[in-house]
Curated annotation (Swiss-Prot):
Belongs to the RNA methyltransferase TrmD family. InterPro entries: Alpha/beta_knot_MTases (IPR029028), tRNA_m1G_MeTrfase_C_sf (IPR023148), tRNA_m1G_MeTrfase_TrmD (IPR002649), tRNA_m1G_MTases_N (IPR029026), tRNA_MeTrfase_TRMD/TRM10 (IPR016009). This is tRNA (guanine-N(1)-)-methyltransferase. One of its GO terms (cellular component) is cytosol. It comes from Helicobacter hepaticus (strain ATCC 51449 / 3B1). It catalyses: guanosine(37) in tRNA + S-adenosyl-L-methionine = N(1)-methylguanosine(37) in tRNA + S-adenosyl-L-homocysteine + H(+). It comes from the Bacteria. Specifically methylates guanosine-37 in various tRNAs. The gene is trmD. It is an enzyme of class 2 (transferase). One of its GO terms (biological process) is tRNA N1-guanine methylation. Homodimer.
Length: 239
């Protein structure tokens, strides 16, 4: 899959792919990445890309003509604008988008984009939460990372995708490790975890995942309850 980033700061993007899992995915040809500098599409020698909003007020807005010129070169790409007004990105979006051939992330700065750019070029507008950051690069990288994990071969062990948080609207069950420094005291771990009965471990993990979700994310727990009720209803219809 190809990932393109339209940005005013290409080095912010490029540096992310110099380590860890996505570096290996890049080296193995599982993904390709390009960071396109919006300034390269500017019309003057000063590479000016922004203007004050015509309605007045503080801040600058990325110009439609400059960014539009860049977007016109990406005719066969699935274009995602990063914006606080976008749909909150979810785990199922990562899986869905992992089947695309080419995704372009449009990273805003200042007060955002000329609205006509979104109307004319956006396939989707995404947000990573109800908060503001200084630019769209970090949110774009978050989406890219989440999507890339679902591409076959990117994770060393495909089983790592099983039982993750947000699968079936639940958080992942708690994980524990062996303790080698006995001088530091911790509470005991669930005894079933270390007995090797995978059926019982699986059942316990499901119960703990439900408890964890109910405690940390009551909103997600309500969605889980609706999901279960819908499943039960569907099963009755099938019978």
């Amino acid at each position: 899959m190809q990932f393109s980033f339209l940005t005013l700061f290409p080095t912010l993007i490029e540096s992310y792919f110099t380590d860890s899992i996505l570096k290996r995915a890049l080296q193995n040809g599982l993904i390709s990445v390009e960071a396109l500098n919006i300034r390269d599409y500017a019309l003057d020698k000063y590479q000016k890309v922004d203007e004050p909003p015509i309605s007045g007020g503080a801040g600058q807005v990325i110009r439609a003509d400059v960014l539009g010129a860049a977007l016109q070169t990406l005719t066969h790409s699935h274009i995602i604008f990063l914006s606080p007004c976008g749909k909150p990105f979810q785990q199922y979006d990562a899986l869905r988008l992992s089947h695309k051939k080419h995704i372009t992330f449009v990273c805003g700065r200042y007060e955002g984009f000329d609205e006509r750019l979104v109307e004319q070029y956006a396939n989707e507008v995404m947000s990573v939460g109800n908060f503001i950051v200084t630019g769209g690069e970090l949110p774009a990288l978050m989406l890219c990372d989440s999507i890339a994990r679902h591409i076959q071969g990117v994770l060393g062990n495909a089983d790592s995708l099983q039982g993750e948080s947000f699968e079936d609207y639940l958080l992942e069950a708690p994980n524990f490790t062996k303790i080698f420094n006995q001088k530091i005291k911790f509470s005991a771990t669930p005894s079933e975890y270390s007995k090797g009965n995978h059926s019982k471990i699986s059942g316990l993990k499901k119960r703990l995942a439900i408890c964890k979700t109910k405690y940390f994310r009551p909103d997600l727990y309500q969605a889980y309850r609706v999901f279960i009720e819908q499943q039960q209803l569907n099963n009755k219809v099938v019978k």
